[in-house]
């Protein structure tokens, strides 16, 4: 009996100590907005200077971070990274919306636990109200232990402390169609960022984003009020931030730009945790929030975490932050970026596609307007270059002077030293591992690229498993999607698909990127003879006379010869011109009828001359 009594006292004492320990831990509430750029009064924005009072109040009573950057410009990847505490490229969750099917599910490394799970194991009640969106398999019941019924009624949290919770806001996705007059923004008064056309359509896009932020600000006000009325504010740290930049601006969301990666980041709470009414100007990786959250809870930061405790006595400001862009729904890309105090370095790995390649926003008015302006020659040269121009291997911007990343300094010799330094920083970051260099499985490609609501994949990566009925090297689905005939057996290449500019043409004779602006191939004659090739064909010949027609222009006189893998098909001399000429080169029937597995075009001319090709087409004479 005495032994039982002693055991009971020990258990009571332990439970009391546990209660006391938990009571001293702060509650932590993340207010997590979708698709939101830092266009608030507290960030110096004039349009919203008096229209975001609740966010501004958080800043005045807490800490505002001026230069906070997410690890990726798309929701699922950023959310996967932050909840794990590590860049998604390290553990394979870098492709947007992975794990769509049983065959493509991604599992975290054995030891990894999600942030809420770690907190739950240390006595926290954890919840998530709204979107999760993680690119890997996870168990909701082991991660989130409490269901918040209403984001506007936090009273049920009073008896569920300490808690770690997330309240998800719609941010840029807020429906602003039926907005009250007090929240509306006149499109005529906004400033359209310099990397967009300044017309009524983009003025409306910018105005809508301001309105969306105002809606969120009202909701944040209600949340803060609930915290105060329930007494929770006395021991609750509140964090406001976003997963990436504005959703309806084409060079914000999904792009490795300042607009796509810089987000609002504000913390408020009890005095014990940070200095109130302070501003931080050091470069912040939003992965730091994961580490800082654990530090607030008094929990050791796991070995795989890349973030730092932002308020540690030993904290040292970062020299740089990195970011990555990979597949986004059906749109395949691979880009890496380094941001230092003054510069942003961008490394593009897939140069056969333009920046504005086919994507989920193609049917939006603003995307259609951009294409319309380009097609009709009404887009400025700088906007043509940004959205539809040849993809550069490297981009380098002084973002303190040029935050909209208009002027690429990568080829300016004055910046060679800085450029070399940023290359080295990228190498340093990549040395910790990047699974983006590994090709996606066919199963994953099929899950994302085939007739989904967001679009049809037109990148060359999808071609490896698709059927090509007529042997022209272009799959049936690709041809149908690009308004070609998949059964005509005709070689026809227009170079107007932004997701695969070269349409399979390649060359080993020139250092140039064959992919030119949307609608063109272009390359320099690095030597007097350059051959471009189209492999992967299965052409059976024809009973009628055939020819190749090529629309091109060049500053050099050229000798042009066409070959199949069985011999020469034809040749023609070209006289230099500054306008496109339609050339017709008759095909030698006997050679053509032997069938073709490849076609090559030999250009002979003055070294360093530029050649631009509008289309290559097989025709019947």
Indicate where each model-derived feature is located:
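Long, internal low-complexity/basic segments
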Residues: 24-26, 33, 37-38, 64, ...
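Formylglycine-dependent sulfatase
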Residues: 21-389, 403-424, 438, 456-464
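Bacterial Sec-dependent N-terminal signal peptides
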Residues: 1-25
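Noncatalytic modules at the cell exterior or secretory-pathway interfaces
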Residues: 590-601
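Extracellular, beta-strand-rich glycan-interacting domains
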Residues: 399-401, 612-621
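Hydrophobic residues on conserved beta-strands that form the core of alpha/beta folds
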Residues: 28, 65, 492, 582, ...
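Short beta-strand-plus-loop segments that form exposed binding edges in beta-rich domains
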Residues: 600-608
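Extracellular ligand-binding interfaces
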Residues: 523-590, 607-612, 618
């Amino acid at each position: 009996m005495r032994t039982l009594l002693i055991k009971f006292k020990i258990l009571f004492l332990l439970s009391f100590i546990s209660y006391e320990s938990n009571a001293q831990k702060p509650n932590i509430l993340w207010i997590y907005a979708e698709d939101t750029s830092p266009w608030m009064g507290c960030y110096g924005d004039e349009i919203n200077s008096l229209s975001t009072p609740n966010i501004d109040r958080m800043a005045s009573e807490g800490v505002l971070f001026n230069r906070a950057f997410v690890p990726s410009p798309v929701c699922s990847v950023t959310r996967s990274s932050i909840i794990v505490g590590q860049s998604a490229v390290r553990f394979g969750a870098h492709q947007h919306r992975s794990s769509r099917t049983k065959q493509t599910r991604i599992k975290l490394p054995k030891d990894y636990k999600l942030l809420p799970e770690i907190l739950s194991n240390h006595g926290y009640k954890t919840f998530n109200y709204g979107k999760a969106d993680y690119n890997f398999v996870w168990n909701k019941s082991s991660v989130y232990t409490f269901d918040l019924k209403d984001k506007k009624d936090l009273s049920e949290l009073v008896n569920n402390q300490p808690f770690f919770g997330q309240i998800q806001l719609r941010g840029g996705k807020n429906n602003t169609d039926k907005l009250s007059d007090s929240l509306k923004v006149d499109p005529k008064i906004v400033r359209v960022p310099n990397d967009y056309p300044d017309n009524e359509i983009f003025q409306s896009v910018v105005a809508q984003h301001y309105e969306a932020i105002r809606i969120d600000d009202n909701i944040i006000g209600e949340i803060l009020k609930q915290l105060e009325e329930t007494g929770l504010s006395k021991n609750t740290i509140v964090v406001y931030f976003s997963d990436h930049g504005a959703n309806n601006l084409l060079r914000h969301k999904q792009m490795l730009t300042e607009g796509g990666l810089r987000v609002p980041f504000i913390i408020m709470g009890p005095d014990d945790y940070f200095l109130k009414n302070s501003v931080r100007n050091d470069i912040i990786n939003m992965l730091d929030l994961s580490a800082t959250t654990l530090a607030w809870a008094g929990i050791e930061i796991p070995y795989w975490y890349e973030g730092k405790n932002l308020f540690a006595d030993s904290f040292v400001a970062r020299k740089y932050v990195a970011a990555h862009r990979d597949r986004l729904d059906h749109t395949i890309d691979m880009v890496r970026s380094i941001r230092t105090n003054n510069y942003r370095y961008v490394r593009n790995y897939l140069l056969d596609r333009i920046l504005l390649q086919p994507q989920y926003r193609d049917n939006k008015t603003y995307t259609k307007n951009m294409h319309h302006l380009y097609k009709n020659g009404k887009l400025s040269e700088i906007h043509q270059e940004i959205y539809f121009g040849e993809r550069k291997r490297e981009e380098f911007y002084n973002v303190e002077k040029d935050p909209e990343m208009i002027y690429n300094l990568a080829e300016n010799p004055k910046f060679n030293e800085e450029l070399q330094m940023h290359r080295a920083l990228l190498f340093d970051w990549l040395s910790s591992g990047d699974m983006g260099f590994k090709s996606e499985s066919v199963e994953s490609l099929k899950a994302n690229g085939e007739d989904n609501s967001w679009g049809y994949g037109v990148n060359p990566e999808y071609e490896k498993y698709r059927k090509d009925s007529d042997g022209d090297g272009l799959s049936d689905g690709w041809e149908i999607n690009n308004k070609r005939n998949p059964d005509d057996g005709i070689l026809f290449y227009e170079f107007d698909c932004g997701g695969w500019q070269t349409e399979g043409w390649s060359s080993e004779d020139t250092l140039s990127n064959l992919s030119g602006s949307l609608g063109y191939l272009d390359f320099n004659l690095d030597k007097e003879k350059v051959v471009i090739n189209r492999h992967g064909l299965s052409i059976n010949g024809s009973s009628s006379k055939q020819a190749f027609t090529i629309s091109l222009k060049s500053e050099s006189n050229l000798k042009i010869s066409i070959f199949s893998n069985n011999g020469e098909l034809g040749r023609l001399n070209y006289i230099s011109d500054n306008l496109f000429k339609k050339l017709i080169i008759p095909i030698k029937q006997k050679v053509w009828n032997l069938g073709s597995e490849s076609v090559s075009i030999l250009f002979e001319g003055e070294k360093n001359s530029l050649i631009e090709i509008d289309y290559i087409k097989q025709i019947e004479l």
